[in-house]
Amino acid sequence: MNIQPNKWAKKVVPGIACLVLAFASQTQTVNAQVNHLTPEEMAHYTPNNPFDRLNDGRPRVPDALLDTIRNMDMAIVEVYALLRDKGFPNQFEGDWKVLQPGKRLVGRAFTVQFMPTRADLNDVMQQDAAAKGWGRLRNQTTIDMLESGDVAVVDLYGKVEEGTFVGDKLAYYIQQKTGTGMVIDGGLFFVEAIEKTGMPIYYRGTHPESLRNSMITGINVPIRVGGATAMPGDVVLGDQDGLLFIPPHLVEEIIDAVKRKRVRDAWSKKQFDTGKYKSSEIYGRPSPELQKDLDQFMRDHGITP
């Protein structure tokens, strides 16, 4: 596992006035952009990250851990309560339309925030984008920034009509570039063609009108996705229940907890199969004799009691 010191930790620029919009305060350097967290700011707002970072400053949860989550076929039902009990009750969002509902979505969040267009603000942000060499600020600006393993998480504030983030061609490009899927709190179109790619996508609805009357107000900033708060670099976990955004510093602990619970559940079923025990004897605190058996069962499955 490639865990390195946080190279941005001692370069933090003072806080931004509005985190959601990422407005730069007057005390920040001229490199700060109205719609984009710098790597230093990213480190400031993700201080618990134990891993190294991508070039844009997002936490780089190791590919090996993402593969572990995929290979475990981890489910939201196994993780939600763990996050809630750790003080993160607002990481789940359900009630989606889903392409490939039987396939898990796992990857690192690349967040994009839209708002209804306001001309004066949009003019300034377009100027900022041009100054950074991005050209015109639009959906393809963010799409071209995606890396392998990223999941585009797009806050289009639930807009479907005139809220189509991608059609079939851009969806295909995203799949080829990231190898994952997408989360669009907004619209999608050409669903039949996109479905053939096998890419899991969570979206709100379909409409033939292209994206308009919306402006990008944030790239890799904290965003709201329904009732959830997503941070750049969060691990996105999607299944048929919905979506979960897992803070990077909890990923290893969650993997361990899910493994332990699965082994404990397997042991419980094994005891029930004997027909010797009541449910109250297995769930809760086992007797010393049963606890000894459980401890050995866990060791046999590679888990330290």
Regions found by a protein language model. Name each.
Residues 57, 174, 234-236:
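Buried hydrophobic positions in well-ordered alpha/beta secondary-structure cores of metabolic enzymes
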Residues 60-61, 230:
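Short, isolated positions in well-ordered beta-strands
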Residues 67, 72-232, 246-305:
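Feature captures the catalytic cores and cofactor-binding loops of soluble hydro-lyases/lyases
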Residues 2-16, 25-26:
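Bacterial N-terminal signal peptides that target proteins for export
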Residues 241-244:
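Channel- or pocket-lining gating/hinge segments that regulate access to a cavity or pore
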Residues 21-29:
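C-terminal segment of classical bacterial N-terminal signal peptides
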Residues 33-55, 64-68:
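Short acidic, Pro/Gly- and aromatic-enriched capping/linker segments at domain boundaries
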